Amino acid sequence: MLEIGDIAPDFTAKDHNGRIVKLSDYRGKTLVLWFYPRASTGGWTAEGIGFQERIQDYKAKDVEILGASTDSIEANAKFASDQGFSYPLLCDTEREVCLAYGACKSSSDSPAKRITYVIDPDGKILQAHETVDARKHPETLLDSL
């Protein structure tokens, strides 16, 4: 897991719409990067919905949301569509982003761990959260910004 003050590793990956997303796209903005193990399951769905329900409050603070998992584009597209997510979901099927951020143990078939990073406008880790209550996390994180 990355530490507060670390430079966030740059990445390039496709989102659930097949668009290329890079960390550098978010330079100058604060970014919440939340990793979740599997699309359309349990607590991760509640957490994703929590971010969506507060998206305007995050935007009011000039904060962008980006979800990430090792799921396929198809699985994440269905997840985003079913839940009405307006923010992108990275499809890190090769686990490159997950490994760089300490959210995967290996490049084998392991899902991402639930980890959230807040990355500041200069690309440094501002906050790092590993153990959270999925239902409350989006609200408590928003309050901390």
Stretches with model-predicted labels:
Residues 1-145:
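Chalcogenol-based redox active-site neighborhoods
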